[in-house]
């Protein structure tokens, strides 16, 4: 059985619902040997363009962990694989890799530094060229005094959509009986010149687990969404906007509601959009009673739109008809997965019905469990710039996978955009072994999808008006909401093997990363236009 990881997303499927063979072809590269099978995994696609594709591979043990930058040419042959792990330093003067970011023209290895003698934590940035050359010394983007390493500042980052701006946010060390503080800095990535910096006093009691979300626009303007728990089920919210470092604060009133799950994007008009779900009273898991929409004008930084409303009855009904469990009523138990900006300034929000169950392994002397991960339907909402709902739809599906791992390594679906059309890819684990077509003939799954296919990878398309396009009749297949991607599956397949962590929107196709059993060999291909 092969393992499949989708690692980028953009697919032009011409007339995909007009014919059963409307699937584009797949171009596969040559198989490549994995030099450290079992200890080496591709974890991130950084970029893919006419110059080639770049990926990060992690390998080694916890105490000897390495990061490799890999380049692949247009035919998906490996050009090089080079270690870009910065020097970890020595005891009392160390660098720990926090995150690896792709910016315009290079790669940034973001490290948390600690200097015991100075009692300072720092944000250290190592620049890496696209040829794999690592800078000998880091750019020290920020420093903060701390009593000890475990109590030093925490650093968070964001890169603008065009890769030209970087922000670093230092969550400054907790101090008892003091107010919470942070420091936000913006850099131009070409020269790594600091454009502006701002010290933030949030004017609320310091918290050991603060809740701040950051984002930066192509202009270098930045935003911080602040959530503060004041008391049991009592929260305060504020939006901090920064234009050239000048700060503007707006209190966001969401009375008697817990803004429990939210995401932020910069829409195509340059405005900030915040969207999420709320719960009233005690919040449990992903349950929500409604949604919160906020849009901040990209120029004036004023809150241009805000809408707080319960889920509509028709939406609850549509979701409940295809849900995998839970109680009916006004609560929708779903996970907020993605928010995607559209070309007209609207955004798409995607939610999924997820559940995890575990059962003790019979006869085991230690605490061992078997896990069942169930993923149900996807609820898709399109929101206008004023927060009103343009349309909604539900992608009905049922996926179940059983494993001994308490961590779900792969997600249940991935997405791509083709103009204003949304493409949803998922591994269909609910296909019968055999069925009858319209003529009464018996058909077998392996005769249609191939013996190597455990579960077919399927595609659903939702057009710009919210209409879902599936397959009216595919060999009499009962699951009519997805087009099985036969050519896509020919190279590699594995149940529910869609990994958004390595899902990258390229300009001219879907890049597929296929790993063989035992991780000894792998190959990369592209689902072409």
Predicted regions mapped to residue ranges:
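Loop/turn-rich, solvent-exposed surfaces of beta-rich toroidal or solenoidal domains
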Residues: 336-357, 361-362, 369-371, 375-379, ...
């Amino acid at each position: 059985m092969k393992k499949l990881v989708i690692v980028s997303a953009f697919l032009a499927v011409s007339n995909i619902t007009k014919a059963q063979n409307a699937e584009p072809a797949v171009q596969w590269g040559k198989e490549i040997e994995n030099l450290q099978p079992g200890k080496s995994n591709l974890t991130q696609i950084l970029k893919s363009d006419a110059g080639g594709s770049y990926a990060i591979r992690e390998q080694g043990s916890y105490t000897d962990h390495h990061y490799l930058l890999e380049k692949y040419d247009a035919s998906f042959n490996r050009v090089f694989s080079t270690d870009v792990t910065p020097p970890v330093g020595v005891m009392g003067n160390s660098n720990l890799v926090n995150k690896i970011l792709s910016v315009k023209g290079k790669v940034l290895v973001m490290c948390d530094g600690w200097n015991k003698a100075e009692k300072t934590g720092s944000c250290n940035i190592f620049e890496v060229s696209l040829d794999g050359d690592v800078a000998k010394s880091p750019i020290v983007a920020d420093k903060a005094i701390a009593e000890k390493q475990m109590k030093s500042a925490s650093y968070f980052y964001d890169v603008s959509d065009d890769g030209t701006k970087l922000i670093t946010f230092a969550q400054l060390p907790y101090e008892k009986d003091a107010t919470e503080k942070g420091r936000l800095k913006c850099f131009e990535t070409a020269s790594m010149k600091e454009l502006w910096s701002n010290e933030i006093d949030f004017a609320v009691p310091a918290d050991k687990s603060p809740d701040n979300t950051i984002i930066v626009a192509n202009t270098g303007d930045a935003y911080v969404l602040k959530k503060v728990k004041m008391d049991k089920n009592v929260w305060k919210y504020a939006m901090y906007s920064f234009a050239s470092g000048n700060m503007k604060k707006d209190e966001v009133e969401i009375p008697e509601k817990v803004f429990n799950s939210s995401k932020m994007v910069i829409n195509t008009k340059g405005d900030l959009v915040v969207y999420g779900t709320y719960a009233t009273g005690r919040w449990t898991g992903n349950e929500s009673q409604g949604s919160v929409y906020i849009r901040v004008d990209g120029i004036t930084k004023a809150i241009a739109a805000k809408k707080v409303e319960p889920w509509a009855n028709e939406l609850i009904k549509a979701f409940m008809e295809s849900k995998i469990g839970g109680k009916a009523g006004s609560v929708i138990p779903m996970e907020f997965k993605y928010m995607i900006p559209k070309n007209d300034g609207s955004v798409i929000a995607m939610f999924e019905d997820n559940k995890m169950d575990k059962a003790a392994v019979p006869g085991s002397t230690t605490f061992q469990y078997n896990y069942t991960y169930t993923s149900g339907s996807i609820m898709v909402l399109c929101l206008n710039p004023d927060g009103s709902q343009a349309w909604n739809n539900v992608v009905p599906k049922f996926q179940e996978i059983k494993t001994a791992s308490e961590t779900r390594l792969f997600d249940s679906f991935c997405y791509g955009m083709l103009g204003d059309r949304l493409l949803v890819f998922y591994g269909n684990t609910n296909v019968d072994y055999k069925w009858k077509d319209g003529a009464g003939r018996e058909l077998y799954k392996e005769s249609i999808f191939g013996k190597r296919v455990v579960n077919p990878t399927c595609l659903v398309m939702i057009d710009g008006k919210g209409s879902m396009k599936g397959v009216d009749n595919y060999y009499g297949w009962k699951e009519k909401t997805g087009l099985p991607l036969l050519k896509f599956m020919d190279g590699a397949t594995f149940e529910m093997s869609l990994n958004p962590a390595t899902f990258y929107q390229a300009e001219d196709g879907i890049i597929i990363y296929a790993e063989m059993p035992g991780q000894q060999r792998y190959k990369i291909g592209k689902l072409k236009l």
